[in-house]
């Protein structure tokens, strides 16, 4: 029952998100970027993991540009080449060679010299499809971030979701593997 309900929420929220106007998207991106920069400053974060927006997710382009201007280290997720459904985080610079992964998402070409261990991240910003007030997130269904975020409380980083207001639902049905986020920044 939970699986069916979760898939229904994914479908509904993705449809709502796809219907946002360009102006709504831009305003939300500006708002979330400012919230994220404030959080980064408060936590004195230096190593920040982000993602390239996909399928209508809130854009991270302005945030990435701002972080580069502040000399912060930006990392993007890469599908782990050997451990299925896990992510690695690679340093991302303006000249980093990129490729599309099996899902059509742009990621840095794997270079082990650019991999940062999770314990060295300060903030890990995550995409999401839906969220609730308790910090529960619903992703695309692959479990990549749930696996990556397991036991995040024992690591040095905090996981923070980035979302549009329209992605909030009253109560998300959860599974035992779901990992609530430290915070969700909404635009």
From Swiss-Prot:
Binding residue positions for ATP: 6-10, 139-146, 178
Superkingdom of origin: Bacteria
KW Nucleotide-binding (keyword) present: yes
Family in the record: Belongs to the 5-formyltetrahydrofolate cyclo-ligase family.
Role noted for this protein: Involved in the removal of 5-formyltetrahydrofolate. In vitro, it is a potent inhibitor of various folate-dependent enzymes in the C1 metabolism network and in vivo it might function as a folate storage. 5-formyltetrahydrofolate is also used as an antifolate rescue agent in cancer chemotherapy. Catalyzes the irreversible ATP-dependent transformation of 5-formyltetrahydrofolate (5-CHO-THF) to form 5,10-methenyltetrahydrofolate (5,10-CH=THF). The reverse reaction is catalyzed by the serine hydroxymethyltransferase GlyA (SHMT).
Pathway the protein takes part in: One-carbon metabolism; tetrahydrofolate interconversion
Keywords recorded for this protein, A-Z: ATP-binding, Ligase, Nucleotide-binding
Reactions this protein catalyses: (6S)-5-formyl-5,6,7,8-tetrahydrofolate + ATP = (6R)-5,10-methenyltetrahydrofolate + ADP + phosphate
The organism of origin for this protein: Haemophilus influenzae (strain ATCC 51907 / DSM 11121 / KW20 / Rd)
Cystine bridges: none
Enzyme Commission number(s) from the entry: 6.3.3.2
PANTHER family: 5-FORMYLTETRAHYDROFOLATE CYCLO-LIGASE, ATPASE INHIBITOR/5-FORMYLTETRAHYDROFOLATE CYCLO-LIGASE
One annotated GO biological process: folic acid-containing compound biosynthetic process
NCBIfam families, alphabetized: MTHFS_bact
CC annotations in GO: cytoplasm
InterPro entries for this protein: FTHF_cligase, FTHF_cligase-like_sf, NagB/RpiA_transferase-like
Name under which the protein is recorded: 5-formyltetrahydrofolate cyclo-ligase
Lineage: Bacteria, Pseudomonadati, Pseudomonadota, Gammaproteobacteria, Pasteurellales
Pfam families named in the record: 5-FTHF_cyc-lig
GO molecular function: 5-formyltetrahydrofolate cyclo-ligase activity; ATP binding
């Amino acid at each position: 029952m939970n699986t069916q309900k979760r898939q229904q929420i994914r479908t509904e929220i993705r449809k709502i998100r796809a219907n946002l106007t360009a102006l709504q998207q831009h305003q939300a991106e500006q708002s979330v970027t400012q919230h994220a920069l404030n959080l980064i400053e408060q936590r004195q974060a230096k190593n920040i993991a982000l993602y390239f927006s996909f399928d209508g997710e809130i854009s991270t382009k302005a945030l990435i540009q701002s972080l580069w201007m502040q000399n912060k280290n930006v990392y993007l997720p890469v599908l782990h080449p050997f451990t299925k459904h896990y992510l690695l985080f690679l340093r991302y610079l303006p000249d980093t060679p990129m490729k599309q992964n099996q899902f059509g998402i742009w990621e840095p070409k794997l270079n082990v010299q650019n991999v940062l261990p999770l314990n060295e991240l300060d903030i890990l910003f995550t995409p999401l499809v839906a969220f609730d007030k308790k910090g529960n997130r619903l992703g695309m269904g692959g479990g990549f971030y749930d696996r990556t975020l397991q036991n995040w409380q024992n690591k040095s980083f905090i996981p923070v979701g980035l979302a549009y207001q329209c992605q909030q639902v009253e109560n998300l049905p959860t599974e035992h593997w779901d990992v609530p986020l430290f915070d969700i920044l909404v635009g």
